[in-house]
UniProtKB/Swiss-Prot annotation:
It is an enzyme of class 6 (ligase). It comes from Escherichia coli O157:H7. InterPro entries: aa-tRNA-synt_IIb, aa-tRNA-synth_II, aa-tRNA-synth_II/BPL/LPL, Anticodon-bd, Anticodon-bd_dom_sf, Pro-tRNA-ligase_IIa, Pro-tRNA-synth_IIa_bac-type, Pro-tRNA-Synthase_IIa_type1. It comes from the Bacteria. This is Proline--tRNA ligase. Disulfide bonds: none annotated. The gene is proS. Consists of three domains: the N-terminal catalytic domain, the editing domain and the C-terminal anticodon-binding domain. Homodimer. Keywords: Aminoacyl-tRNA synthetase, ATP-binding, Cytoplasm, Ligase, Nucleotide-binding, Protein biosynthesis. Pfam families: HGTP_anticodon, tRNA-synt_2b, tRNA_edit. It catalyses: tRNA(Pro) + L-proline + ATP = L-prolyl-tRNA(Pro) + AMP + diphosphate. It is found in: Cytoplasm. One of its GO terms (molecular function) is ATP binding.
């Protein structure tokens, strides 16, 4: 490709509305342009990277035995009504009617469509297992699209769906997809972790997220410093303290705390260790309960894990925090004065709270706290559960090492769906025993456009993008200095351009009438891994300057050796 016949579209300045580095660099490198909120046009350089990512995904999915299909973006509403997700999905599901007033949705995912296809196409267990995938546009009407293509409304996704007649068969495919995803992200040169995850709105049982580690990530990724244990913050288990509860050394005392409505204020005003405080959060109880609310207690320096809390049998789903009015109707005190003593509703305490002694908590009287509370002396120990987020330094749940926490960008997610959708849509086949058998499903997604942004978040410097070789838009940049004035430079540039292309190498020849500084800046911004610079001064010695983008090292290579050298660097 020649720059004179290419839309380079680089920008010198960073657009003001671009928050994260990937968004900034994708705009500056001429990869994308914003059309509307959460909607982007992909320019040639961006498309080249996108296709590289797609091709790696496609190759590994095919290698793992998956079969490619293509399903419509527009889906009839009756399928979503049949699955029950028409009511469940919420405003992210874009709904519309056609000219015949028939309701449709713009697909955010394709479980319903593929299950409908399978229930009409398969009839016998002998046809299974099967795993279908597509690389297709999705649309989710995000309330606040941000970070460029990281959280856009329209995006490209690889989604796969497998069908089975047994859990054992599903597990085999799930393991194959886990391995395929690991190969995909390794081939792309990404630093990632596969972590245990919550199944969320998709549903099902087992689930793993593939997280690219990056400071700008929206997720907290938890992993052991010595073992393979990894989970997202929502699922990571906070194990109970090993040390037994210390004996009481204080009497419980009622203290006036009129200006201490938060843990921070309580700690500051009374010079308390925060680890000796407990905060109490009230949430709505499950429908049909004899109590309207449930009290959840965590240590003052810990955070409630809402996913864990929502899974408690006595707690309503989705998790809903009580309003001050609802709290006062039950407890007769406001949110800043709540605690376990004389709490008139069910109480669930975190494992760490259960190990505390001589602690401080609200007295369920406005402006008052109890100091020196001890379990079983001042109040009976209530139900104990793991309901907090882990923190760095906690022991790993597998008993090996301690936990580290880093930010991550979710680029892939695999689920064991079970029979959630096949039961709802009555997808079954004749089993080996001749009886009708509901199919068991797996679901496997990769955010293709998000992978591009995540790769940049891990691979950049002050000059621009530093692409991993496997997904760079071009492999080699040829920068001929003053080629329009030097016949020797021009002739060699054309010769090398042809020879490298003949070797199957993707080359960008910068044949613009531009200053060298502009040419260098653009190539470094775009992030092409290998650059060769042709200039009369070096050619006098039969030399070409070679530069590797990742480490910035330069070296002189003889003209006759440069093609062989580049082929070896790129192809090994």
């Amino acid at each position: 490709m020649r720059t004179s016949q290419y839309l380079l579209s680089t920008l010198k300045e960073t657009p003001a509305d671009a928050e994260v580095i990937s968004h900034q660099l994708m705009l500056r490198a001429g990869m994308i342009r914003k059309l509307a909120s959460g909607l982007y046009t992909w320019l040639p350089t961006g498309v080249r990277v996108l296709k590289k990512v797609e091709n790696i995904v496609r190759e590994e999915m095919n290698n793992a035995g998956a079969i490619e299909v293509s399903m419509p973006v527009v889906q009839p509403a009756d399928l979503w009504q049949e699955s029950g997700r028409w009511e469940q999905y919420g405003p992210e599901l874009l709904r519309f009617v056609d000219r015949g007033e028939r309701p449709f949705v713009l697909g955010p995912t394709h479980e319903e469509v593929i299950t409908d296809l399978i229930r009409n196409e398969l009839s016998s267990y002998k046809q299974l297992p099967l795993n279908f995938y597509q690389i297709q546009t999705k649309f989710r009407d995000e309330v606040r699209p941000r970070f460029g293509v990281m959280r856009s409304r329209e995006f490209l996704m690889k989604d796969a769906y497998s069908f089975h007649t047994s859990q054992e068969s599903l597990q085999e495919t799930y393991d194959a997809m886990y391995a395929a995803y690991s190969k995909i992200f390794s081939r792309m040169g990404l630093d990632f972790r596969a972590v245990q995850a919550d199944t969320g709105s998709i549903g099902g049982s087992a689930s793993h997220e593939f997280q690219v580690l990056a400071q700008s990530g929206e997720d907290d990724v938890v992993f052991s410093d010595t073992s393979d244990y990894a989970a997202n913050i929502e699922l990571a288990e906070a194990i109970a303290p090993k040390e037994p509860r210390a004996a009481a050394t204080q009497e419980m005392t009622l203290v006036d705390t009129p200006n201490a409505k938060t843990i921070a204020e309580l700690v500051e005003q009374f010079n308390l260790p925060i680890k000796k405080t407990v905060k109490t959060l009230l949430v709505k109880a499950v429908e049909g309960s004899s109590f309207p609310l449930v009290a959840l207690l965590v240590r003052g320096d810990h955070e409630l894990n809402e996913v864990k809390a929502e899974k408690l049998p006595q707690v309503a789903s989705p998790l809903t925090f009580a309003t001050e009015e609802e709290i006062r109707a039950v407890v007769k005190a406001g949110p800043g004065s709540l605690g376990p003593v004389n709490m008139p509703i069910p109480v669930v305490i975190d494992r760490t709270v259960a190990a505390m002694s001589d602690f401080t908590a609200g007295a369920n009287i406005d402006g008052k706290h109890y100091f020196g509370i001890n379990w079983d002396r001042d109040v009976a120990t209530p139900e104990v559960a793991d309901i907090r987020n882990v923190v760095a330094g906690d022991p790993s749940p597998d008993g090996q090492g301690t936990l580290l926490i880093k930010r991550g960008i979710e680029v892939g997610h695999i689920f064991q769906l079970g029979t959630k959708y096949s039961e709802a849509l009555k997808a079954s086949v004749q089993g080996e025993d001749g009886r009708n058998q509901i199919l068991t499903m797996g679901c496997y997604g990769i955010g293709v456009t998000r992978v591009v942004a995540a790769a940049i978040e891990q691979n950049y410097d002050e000059r621009g993008i530093v692409w991993p070789d496997a997904i760079a838009p071009f492999q080699v940049a040829i920068l001929p200095m003053n080629m329009h004035k030097s016949f020797r430079v021009q002739e060699l540039a054309e010769k090398l351009y042809s020879e490298l292309r003949a070797q199957g190498i993707e080359v960008l020849l910068d044949d613009r009438k531009e200053r060298p500084g502009v040419m260098f800046a653009d190539m470094e911004l775009i992030g092409i891994p290998h650059t060769i610079v042709l200039g009369d001064r070096n050619l006098d010695n039969d030399d070409i300057e070679y530069k590797y983008r990742r480490n910035g090292e330069k070296q002189l290579i003889k003209t006759g050796d440069i093609v062989e050298y580049l082929v070896k660097q790129i192809k090994g």
